[in-house]
Amino acid sequence: MTPSNSLSSSERSLSGECSVDGNSCDRGIEDECSSHSSQEDVELTKEVKVDRLERKSKSMPSDILDILDEKSKENSVENVQFLSDREDDSDDVPVWEPPEPENPEDEVDGVFADDDDDCCDGSKWNKASLLGELSDESSEKRKVYEENRRVMLEEADSKFKFIVSQLIKSAGFSIEESGYWFEIVARLCWEAASMLKPAIDGKSVDPTEYIKVKCIATGSCVDSEVFKGLVFKKHAALKHMATKYEHPRIMLVEGVLGHPISGFSSLQSVNQDNEYLLKYVKPVVDIIEASKPDVMLVEKSVSRDIQKTILDKGVTLVFDMKLHRLQRISRCIGSPILSVDSLSSQKLKHCDSFRIEKIVEEHNAAGESDKKPTKTLMFLEGCPTRLGCTILLKGCHSERLKKVKEVVQYSFILAYHLMLEASFLADRHTMFSTIFAKEATSCVVEIENFSPSPSPRESPSEAVDIPVSNGFDEQTIQINGEADGEKVGTWESDGDHVFSHEPYNPVIFTGFSSLSARLSKYLGFVQNPESVPVSVDTDVSTTSNLDSIRESEEDTAEKNEDKQPLLLDPELPVNSSSDDGDNKSQTENDIESTLESQSILVLVSKRNALRGIMCDQRHFSHIKFYKHFDVPLEKFLRDMFNQRNLCQTCVEFPEAHLYYYAHQNKQLTIQIKRIPVAKGLAGEAKGKIWMWSRCGKCKTKNASRKSTKRVLISTAARSLSFGKFLELSFSQQTFLNRSSSCGHSFDSDFLHFFGLGSMVAMLSYSQVASYTVSLPPMKLESSILIKAGWLEKEFQTVFTKGISLFEDAAGFLKRLRSQFTNSDLRYQRARKLLSNIEELLKHERCIFEENIKNSFDKAKTIDDVSHRLLRLNRMRWELLLQALIWNYRLQSLVLSDRLLPSSDETKIYEQGLKTVSEAGMTRYENDNKVSDSGSNGGIDTPLVEHKDIPIAGASVGDNDQMAESYVPEDNESQTLCSSSPDTTSPINNHFDTHLAVNVHSTNGQEADKSIPVTGESLDDEVSTSNGPHILGWDEWFWLPFEELRSKRIVDIEKEYLLKFEYVNNFTQENLQTVNQIITEESSRLRISLRDDDFIVSDYEDELSSLIACALAHLNNEESKKPLSRCIHGSLQGFLDNNQDSKQTDRDVSRFSSESTNRLETLPPPEVLVTFGSVKSVGKPKYSIVSLYADDFRDLRKRCCSSELDYIASLSRCKPWDAKGGKSKSVFAKTLDDRFIVKEIKKTEYESFVTFATEYFKYMKDSYDLGNQTCLAKVLGIHQVTVRQPKGGGKEIRHDLMVMENLSFSRKVTRQYDLKGALHARFTATSANGEDDVLLDQNFVNDMNKSPLYVSKTSKQNLQRAVYNDTSFLTSINVMDYSLLVGVDDENHELVCGIIDYLRQYTWDKQLETWVKSSLVVPKNVQPTVISPIDYKTRFRKFMKTHFLCVPDQWCDQGDS
């Protein structure tokens, strides 16, 4: 808790009474890298002399000045300066230099002294004694100081009375009883707290050890009193002893006096008797004669003969006092406790009076005739020190008094807390009041964006938001801005009872630690009363009638516009149903729980700032207020200032360290510094401790920092519990939230200082960024984000290709038109036909532009990004369809007779039929020769190789008879020209109709070409169902494009495209854009999801798209009929058209045999899907094996929005160059960033098969039972085999795992891969460090340097999930898994999930463990790979230790 030895036990011990070190058991895991250097530093530093107090200045690292929340210079430890004014830094006052005192006479020794233990002038201990005559100015300041203290105490008293009234009511007293007991309890507790003065050094600070409550069933209630002394239920040893003394001398004896003499017999010798007297009796007689006590109090028993000896000496003896009672008496009267073994003469202390009195408890009598019970009490009154008193309760039966006793015990603690806090806050006000008098205009604000709060005139509303604390919950009321402030608007409360426990619990009651607006206005904290919190409890301190309290509370609901009840604290919600029994019971429980909450849990650490090492690892310290291991504020500061308290880790002085205390969203940083002796503070010999504050962000016009004057801390403030001081620091104080006259916050912008002599402690407060731990979600969200501009770019590419297609076709038509001169009447019909086709081209171009615009608009509005990608595939299909139909249309014009003259026109010419076309048209003659008749140059068709190019790829339901092309018989063929019917070669009937022609090239060479026939006989069955055709032609490709577009893709492929499977060199030479589109898109798969607007396609370099195609096919098959399942069953939806059954069987058996041999067990259920065509030039063939398809589908039903969404996400992916991955292995993310596709090792593939059943059961139980888990969900295991067409059909197999992306929809700035091991787990970061995956040692180092705190709830959830998952992974013999932690600074989240949990602890890993343990890693250090049980233990311990949790709630006594 502190750097001193006196508090070391508080930091380390595991005690429910005093301190809880939440991570004590985990601190065995040390930073291995830093530990070696740290040990070297320790060895070197041990040579430093302990008594050397003056240190040479050392360079201070920048992180020391970071706590000042401002840019600063790196300077020596002696001269830390703010970098406030870069133009004139030399004039800046050092931040450590103490300002002038608020009262100069405080610096004069003997002018102002606090009461000491020997002061018995009757003044209250928490007030100052004025010694000597003070100047008029000092007297005036003292009057103001005392007035401030008086107002503080009055405010505290008003809050105290309200709590007492609630406690009495909760004790079950009637209204009448509550009335008089309320006044009595409040008076007694406040009087006792005012009188008590616990010692600071060497004695307990627990107030309950200085006060006792005794119940005496006699007299009346008003006779109850605070007895200024001690009362015990004891009597004198012998009845003849005196029972009353004035100023008696009291001797305290520990142990047993004398020895029992019952063992002596009549035969014992006189020598034995004398020996007993000399050994036991004589020392007692000697000490009595030397010290002359009046009263002897002995811890244990006293022998009979010694009792008589003491009686003979005229001394009153009381024995069986118990040691703790003697200690209380010793503390109060200042007399030592003597040991029976070493009784010696001592100067005994005395009290004012001693008496033993028998009291008749008439209220305990059962009836009037019964004997009234009596009680013998021993009174020690008027002790010389105010270190103990007793509250005597009288006036009713003992059972009733016991209830009052409980109320008194609680109330006294509250009163004591309040009194010390009031004194401390009064001192702080005195300090801050020295800065209020200065005008805000004297300050030069250095914050560029600083904007002062609006004035009352600029306030948008007269209603004021008032934070009201009920002790646990920060609530808000609105009070209309009226002058009297009596009307209350709306109370906003989450609870119906008096005390609410969530979410913030300043210990005991925040109301005690908060100033009301009335007090704030009086003290001058409020500069704009209409914009600051105010309080409603204006008359609390003047009311004592409890009946009026009850009546006022009952009438609150009906009279909410009337004045608030006098004792109704504004910080408690109004409960209109307080008479309800359940609410009453709940209120009592809440009050009891509240009063037991007397502690604070803080995260404590200590760091050597000069060396940059952690001397005290972060751990929890449970500080119970005013208990044994708590210390007063004065002692804490003295231990800080004691330069002889060397750090046990680095053997350095406290001055070299930074001390951190974190709670909820705040962190307190303490730094110690020795200032020059010349500038030291006065009164060090007298123990005077000063405090002051200085703004860290501004300067006044004379270039000095805005600073308060320093004030002397009062005795009561020095006695404040350090734990309570932390509570005041971390709770939201009204005046700390106010801005100073310079416009800066006292809380966040001011530095606070305490000083004693030449030692100064600087305290700075900063906000703690608390992170939440985000575990893998049970339900995966659909992606709504995609890389900016990517979709637009892809649509733009499709659009550009489409425009090029239409321009390519238009250019061809233009060249074709040029072949028909206007003067030649024979081609008038051709020119008209070409004009109509050009109009058709323009029309379809407009339609295309409109369609792609509409599709893009729809894609942008789709919520799921993956569906946008599917809509893009739809546009690619339409682009391909557009290219195909214009290819066929233009070829049909060239190769048919529609552009040739009619038979009547040909008779005009005597030379016979010759068709000339420079656009590449051919003329067919009887000798099967084609000549070029165009003098202007036609469309050349050079000789090229025969190529088979699939138009639309293989599709579901392809017929084997369509696999190969053929040329029909003579009677089925159709020539290009009606006069040449014998130009084709006969081929077998069973093939599709094709025309084989000899094409003469321009160089006279001859080649055999396959050209699709477009005759009418081919389209007989199609034309009957196609409806109206363009230009009256009945070929399918002359149908309107909108009509074709509306047809199902499968229907178009089956009915049209498969009958025109090949294209010739015509397209390659004359329609290059069309040829490019057909080449790129024709071999691509197209599988519809739901409808043809969403299409899944395959992309060769994106393996996830192959998986998506396979899953889409299986999904479509399942929607049609139940999917047959068997081990190694195959579904060949995308089979090679010419693949024979032998090849298929061979593939299936290959997978079967490999799986069986590898797994050595029954092979898992597999679904095999193959697709790809060997006729596709350069197109590989694929086969996909999906393991446990049904089980994975069931898992995806639980965690994914739908199966279709999952498939859509996998449809596109991008390579992901994640650092730390295996080289040449597949590692990709889906384009919507939702999933990760990772290639796994063969051993991992085999391991998963062995525990897959347990995995699915564990995940099912997690969903059904709601168990916490942080396993990154594996949603599919697929084996993708790629058979390349080149290189002899070489096969490449990829074992792929589909896993959720933990960093989905988050901006992760850095990632850690944590295995719980530190050896060889450090990686050097790159220049930018964005994509680096850091390891365990990096995480430990970063947590020490710049910790990332998590909330208590988040850490509990993480630990619970880690516990569940590691237990499961150990049960299936898995180790070497990692916790992936992504830091999202924008959302303040730590994204966590366990990954890489497919590797079992097989014999090869066991061998690796043995080798590394024996030969590689240092002694007593574990390698990364160890047995699953040891791995689980180490993994859990690391996560518990290094995830730092800031306490977000105040602790009660049960939190130990």
Swiss-Prot record:
Signal as UniProt keyword: no
SUPFAM superfamilies assigned to the protein according to its UniProt record, in alphabetical order: GroEL apical domain-like, SAICAR synthase-like
EC number in record: 2.7.1.150
Biased composition (Low complexity): 1-19, 533-544
UniProt domain PIPK: residue ranges: 1115-1443
Cofactor(s) listed: Mg(2+); Mn(2+)
Keyword Transferase among record annotations: yes
GO biological process: phosphatidylinositol metabolic process
Biased segments, Acidic residues type: 86-110
Biased composition (Polar residues): 973-987, 1150-1159
Bias-annotated ranges (Basic and acidic residues): 43-57
Catalytic activity entry: a 1,2-diacyl-sn-glycero-3-phospho-(1D-myo-inositol-3-phosphate) + ATP = a 1,2-diacyl-sn-glycero-3-phospho-(1D-myo-inositol-3,5-bisphosphate) + ADP + H(+)
Quaternary structure and partners: Component of the PI(3,5)P2 regulatory complex at least composed of ATG18, SAC/FIG4, FAB1 and VAC14.
General function of this protein: The PI(3,5)P2 regulatory complex regulates both the synthesis and turnover of phosphatidylinositol 3,5-bisphosphate (PtdIns(3,5)P2). Catalyzes the phosphorylation of phosphatidylinositol 3-phosphate on the fifth hydroxyl of the myo-inositol ring, to form phosphatidylinositol 3,5-bisphosphate.
Name of the molecule in the record: Putative 1-phosphatidylinositol-3-phosphate 5-kinase FAB1D
Organism: Arabidopsis thaliana
Organism placement in taxonomy: Eukaryota, Viridiplantae, Streptophyta, Embryophyta, Tracheophyta
Underlying gene: FAB1D
